[in-house]
Amino acid sequence: MHTYKSGCIFNTLSDIKDRHIVVMGLGLNGGGEACVRFFLKHGAYVLATDMKTAEQLKPTIDRLASDPELNTSKLTYRLGEHCIEDFKNADCVIKNPGVKIEGNKYLSAAKNIETDISIFLHFTKAPVIAVTGSKGKSSTVSAIHYGLNSAGYTAFLGGNITVSPLTFLEKTTEKTPVVLELSSWQLADLRGRGSLKPKISIITKIVPDHQNWYHAMEPYVADKQYG
């Protein structure tokens, strides 16, 4: 199991300005796109890299290109391949949770590795409700989020439920609860950082899952227990 060093490369949001960031995994589901938007907004130079081609990623690329609020002069792409020099030269690599760090030559070359979840947890002051498990995560976080908003709170919902918490980081305060659905992979990417300190932790039913990745229940359960 990989353990990350504690803390975050960025002490403040202003530290992001003019840093060179590699977003590994632009994708089509919004997570990589949210990372690109966040780091461009804070003045970083961003290289988005993905094994998918520009044609395959056209919807995401078009959304970024057509947003007048983004300074896309600081955005470059490397698509259809990864280049190890990009990872060596970056100040920080933003890792997709679906990429294994063990045995990955690109991530091994990186000076610093973060995720959207690790960045969010480092900077938010919001109380966090963290939910993991094999079955029932999404319905559980959705119910909690609905209940909090119905009770008069301004609550946010993100994580594995396909909403990156970076999209609402700067709207959070000590009074805005955040409900995070966290997969085993997202939890593994937090090991050693010391940033996950939820007010409430919930683990739903655990059953064999993702065994093509873990090859045994013990490491899978160990990642879930981290939550």
Language-model segments: residues:
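Phosphate-binding loop of NTP-binding sites
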Residues: 85-90, 97, 101-227
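N-terminal leader/targeting and accessory segments in enzymes
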Residues: 1-115
